[in-house]
Regions:
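Structural signature of PLP-dependent enzymes
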Residues: 2-30
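Short, glycine-/Ser/Thr-/acidic-enriched flexible segments
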Residues: 9-10, 55-57, 90-92, 167-170, ...
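Short, hydrophobic alpha-helical segments
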Residues: 11, 15, 103, 107-110
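Conserved PLP-binding catalytic core of the aspartate aminotransferase-like
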Residues: 21-71, 80-107, 118-142
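Short, flexible, solvent-exposed loop/turn segments with mixed acidic/basic and small polar residues
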Residues: 41-42, 73-78, 148-158
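Conserved short beta-strand edge segments in small beta-sheet-based binding/regulatory domains
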Residues: 108-117, 186-189
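C-terminal accessory/binding modules appended to enzymatic or scaffolding proteins
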Residues: 124-189
Length: 189
């Protein structure tokens, strides 16, 4: 009977969720409006996602995530350019207010003008299949220049890979690795 009780609980939750979602969405819009009025640059249109491009506010996504973490708020994703927070009615109003207070308490600084490196132009040495099945090793990105990538290198799945299996790692790829915090990569032996 445990499974039936679980199904009953899930059905109750789903029946209640629509109402709680309809009540929660305007609160999220209010939070987004407060953040925008405070000077945060918000991007995207997903109603339950708060996506901040914080460089115009003087922080990297990683830096703003660290500040929010001090208040017990953990981002879904952050990198040098973005911070993403996933919101849900299950978080409750207290969490939204805690997030609002934490964001509005962050002191605005001079904008950060550093931008991400250009997107690499791939130079192929092997087909992806050949590269995947070739003997490989993991090395620091500082030693990867000129080597052939043995595995897709991405900062946070699901993301666009910086280098795909079979591509030659050039200076642009190395700069992107470093910018996005990738310290090691797989290369063909």
């Amino acid at each position: 009977y445990l499974i039936l009780q679980s199904l009953d609980a899930a059905n109750d939750r789903m029946a209640e969720f629509k109402r709680s979602l309809c009540e929660f969405l305007p609160k999220v819009e209010g939070l987004k409006g407060d953040a925008a009025r405070c000077g945060y640059e918000l991007v995207g249109t997903e109603p339950l996602k708060l996506t901040v491009a914080p460089k115009s506010y003087g922080y990297t996504g990683d830096g703003l995530a660290a500040i929010l973490r001090e208040s017990g708020i953990f981002a879904e994703f952050h990198d040098p350019d973005m911070l993403v927070l996933m919101l849900s009615p299950l978080c409750g109003d207290g969490t939204l207010e805690k997030l609002r207070a934490a964001l509005l308490a962050v002191e605005r600084k001079a904008p950060i003008t550093e931008t991400s490196p250009p997107v690499p132009s791939p130079k192929w040495a092997l087909t992806p299949r050949e590269a995947i099945f070739a003997p490989s090793e993991i090395i620091p990105v500082d030693r990867s220049l000129g080597r052939v990538s043995a595995a897709a290198a991405i900062s946070c799945p699901p993301a666009v890979p910086i280098a795909v299996c079979g591509e030659v790692i050039d200076e642009c790829v190395v700069r992107n690795f470093k910018y996005y915090g990738i310290e090691k990569c797989a290369v063909i032996k």
